[in-house]
């Protein structure tokens, strides 16, 4: 099929790679280059870089105006495929392809509609998630469901690891969806909007560890935000990102207070419920390190506290 593909982050690269080996991708639409990092270096999206490497035509519109509409119309797509593009499509664009627009969404809709379904489901401690292929409408992930595939969530998995798994599944599922779409056998099941939950974009405050929360909630926050953007706390006036932790058995101390900091008992910090065993962390301006290396270098004392 002749396809216009819309996507931006790394999650959207795997489906695009799969599509170009099975279909004709006539045009790729992605977000414009943007400044990122401390040096504010201008970088291209992963989808743009992949498309250029594979000699695909790419456009990076700031908004959907008449010029963009005409560019998409000119390639005569049979279907538009979207994966984490980052913008809602106006009706004029949705109405261009005769087979409609399909979205690859990283949750089991109607749950976790929105921009950050992977992080939000991990932060909530969900045991299951998946991929949904849906027919797009003008709403935020409100269209009819075509296909879904469930994935059990290992309680140690990180956001980055889950994203890779879901990208692979999404790539396979969109190929199956397009095959059935062309054959006339792709289902359309309306969502139960009363069951809808939402996954809003991550904010800076989502990165802050609140030690009054339970150890399980903090552990879920840490793994959800690994590797980007990371969850952090403050120790001796400086930020420290915590990359890996597990729930411990100790409780009864002030939240944030160091309970143990030795090789026998590990690095245990009190929370609002139980203790949090810190396994891997990264001081501001430094490299990731094990808890043992942190103890050797910083010598934290029992009774010292991590700030919220």
Swiss-Prot record:
EC number(s) given by UniProt: 2.1.2.9
UniProt-listed Gene3D superfamilies: Formyl transferase, C-terminal domain, Formyl transferase, N-terminal domain
Keywords: Protein biosynthesis, Transferase
Origin: domain of life: Bacteria
GO CC terms in record: cytosol
Entry-linked HAMAP family: Formyl_trans
Function, in words: Attaches a formyl group to the free amino group of methionyl-tRNA(fMet). The formyl group appears to play a dual role in the initiator identity of N-formylmethionyl-tRNA by promoting its recognition by IF2 and preventing the misappropriation of this tRNA by the elongation apparatus.
NCBIfam families in UniProt: fmt
Name of the molecule in the record: Methionyl-tRNA formyltransferase
Origin organism lineage: Bacteria, Bacillati, Bacillota, Clostridia, Thermoanaerobacterales
């Amino acid at each position: 099929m002749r396809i216009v593909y819309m996507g931006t982050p790394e999650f959207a690269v795997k489906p695009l790679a799969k599509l170009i080996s099975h279909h004709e991708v006539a045009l790729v639409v992605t977000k414009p280059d943007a400044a990122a990092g401390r040096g504010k270096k201008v970088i291209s999206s992963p989808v743009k870089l992949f498309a250029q490497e594979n000699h695909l035509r790419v456009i990076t519109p700031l908004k959907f105006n008449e010029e963009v509409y005409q560019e998409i119309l000119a390639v005569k797509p049979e279907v538009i495929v979207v994966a984490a593009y980052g913008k809602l499509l106006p009706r004029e664009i949705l109405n261009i392809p005769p087979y409609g627009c399909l979205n690859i969404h990283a949750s089991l809709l109607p749950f976790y509609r929105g921009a950050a379904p992977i992080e939000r489901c991990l932060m909530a401690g969900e045991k299951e998630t998946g991929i949904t292929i849906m027919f797009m409408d003008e709403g935020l992930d409100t269209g009819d469901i075509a296909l879904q595939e469930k994935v059990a969530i290992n309680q140690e998995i990180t956001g980055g690891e889950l994203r890779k798994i879901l990208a692979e599944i999404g790539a396979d599922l969109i190929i199956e969806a397009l095959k059935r779409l062309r054959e006339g056998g792709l289902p359309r099941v309306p969502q139960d909007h009363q069951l809808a939950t939402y996954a809003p974009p991550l904010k800076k405050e989502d990165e802050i560890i609140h030690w009054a929360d339970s150890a399980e909630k903090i552990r879920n926050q840490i793994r959800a935000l690994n590797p980007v953007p990371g969850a952090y706390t403050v120790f001796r006036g400086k930020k420290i990102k915590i990359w890996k932790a597990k729930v411990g058995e100790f409780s009864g101390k002030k939240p944030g207070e160091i309970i143990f900091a030795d090789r026998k008992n590990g690095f245990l910090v009190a929370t609002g419920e139980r203790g949090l065993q810190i396994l891997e962390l990264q001081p501001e301006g430094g490299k990731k390190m094990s808890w043992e290396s942190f103890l050797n270098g910083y010598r934290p004392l029992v009774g010292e506290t991590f700030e919220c």
